[in-house]
């Protein structure tokens, strides 16, 4: 019997190619044009995006990227490449490709790379621990568009999410314990997830529940009293209500109420990026300290940590 060759496609959001206004504008144009991300009427959205948002936000966001850019490139790309390389080293007989929903390398190039290596079955692992229509479903949509152009399509196994997978929780818990060992146990552990519009949740996106699932399992694994852990949502965009409580407002409130030591983990980010390294590690640190807090640490994403790579090995094992 013919044995079909299996490959793994690691998918993530994407990043500008350079920390310049032009590169950021190209990236934001593609990202904010996806109806899975912003579902506003195109008649209203296009003029606003092209005439107001891109011209104003691109230079501002480029400066933020410049503050976290690494010698090898964008943090998200650097850590994603390291994940790809580490997983490939761990699974030498399984091709591993990296594709981004926006920017490069594209999901299309990742699929073509795997097909060129003789892969007949692709295990798609979107590196979003908690499902959302604006992230995981966007990967699904793009994958469908790519395969619609192929005469012969490969078999596909699509991993929807892994919010409460034991290996993911184990890796998160280990990273928290390591931070506690270095900095001491904080008064409060804040779990900050990327937000989505509240309307998306009202319409059936189960993202908030998947965040609660991760929080519940992590608190249990750490053995912390529930009152010493809070779950918040960051990175809101636009004027409509997003999931609450908001991370920045919560940190301000905690500082004002006398909380002195906080550590922040972002369980929804598989790799460090602008939203963690700048928004959480810098901006929100300032918010907390200016409100009266005294000690604040950001716990890094799992990135290419050994336990994270082992999770990917075990998560994809049933499909290989």
UniProtKB/Swiss-Prot annotation:
Keyword terms: Cytoplasm, Heme biosynthesis, Iron, Lyase, Metal-binding, Porphyrin biosynthesis
This enzyme's EC code(s): 4.98.1.1
Pathway field: Porphyrin-containing compound metabolism; protoheme biosynthesis; protoheme from protoporphyrin-IX: step 1/1
InterPro entries reported in the protein's UniProt record: Ferrochelatase (IPR001015), Ferrochelatase_AS (IPR019772), Ferrochelatase_C (IPR033644), Ferrochelatase_N (IPR033659)
Enzyme class: lyase
Chief location bin: cytoplasm
GO cellular component, one term: cytoplasm
Location within or outside the cell: Cytoplasm
Reactions performed catalytically: heme b + 2 H(+) = protoporphyrin IX + Fe(2+)
CDD domains attached to this UniProt entry: Ferrochelatase_C, Ferrochelatase_N
Biological-process GO terms, alphabetical: heme biosynthetic process
Top-level lineage group: Bacteria
Single Gene Ontology MF annotation: metal ion binding
Residues where Fe cation binds: 194, 275
Family annotation (HAMAP family): Ferrochelatase
Family membership noted in the UniProt record: Belongs to the ferrochelatase family.
Its biological purpose: Catalyzes the ferrous insertion into protoporphyrin IX.
PANTHER family: FERROCHELATASE, FERROCHELATASE, MITOCHONDRIAL
Protein name: Ferrochelatase
Organism of origin: Klebsiella pneumoniae (strain 342)
